[in-house]
């Protein structure tokens, strides 16, 4: 059970970071273009 919680936490953190970068980059590129 502990391993599952740790895995979920790791995936959640990675997902949030990837989502933030993916959402923050397009607007910049669009504005620059």
From Swiss-Prot:
User: Which organism does this record belong to?
Assistant: Spinacia oleracea
Query: Where in the cell does this protein reside?
Result: Plastid, Chloroplast thylakoid membrane
Concerning its family, UniProt says: Belongs to the PsbT family.
Bilayer topology: Single-pass membrane protein
Pfam families, per database record? PsbT
Report one GO cellular component.
Answer: chloroplast thylakoid membrane
Q: Tell me which PANTHER family the record gives.
A: PHOTOSYSTEM II REACTION CENTER PROTEIN T (PTHR36411:SF2), PTHR36411
- What keywords sit in the KW lines? Chloroplast, Formylation, Membrane, Photosynthesis, Photosystem II, Plastid, Thylakoid, Transmembrane, Transmembrane helix
Where are residues bearing N-formylmethionine located in the sequence?
1
Assembly, in brief, is: PSII is composed of 1 copy each of membrane proteins PsbA, PsbB, PsbC, PsbD, PsbE, PsbF, PsbH, PsbI, PsbJ, PsbK, PsbL, PsbM, PsbT, PsbY, PsbZ, Psb30/Ycf12, at least 3 peripheral proteins of the oxygen-evolving complex and a large number of cofactors. It forms dimeric complexes.
Gene behind this chain? Answer: psbT
Single biological process term from Gene Ontology? photosynthesis
From the record, give the transmembrane residue ranges. Answer: 3-23
Q: Would the keyword Protease be found if you checked this record's keyword annotation?
A: no
**What's the superkingdom here?**
Eukaryota
Q: Tell me, in a sentence or two, what this protein's role is.
A: Found at the monomer-monomer interface of the photosystem II (PS II) dimer, plays a role in assembly and dimerization of PSII. PSII is a light-driven water plastoquinone oxidoreductase, using light energy to abstract electrons from H(2)O, generating a proton gradient subsequently used for ATP formation.
Q: This protein is called what?
A: Photosystem II reaction center protein T
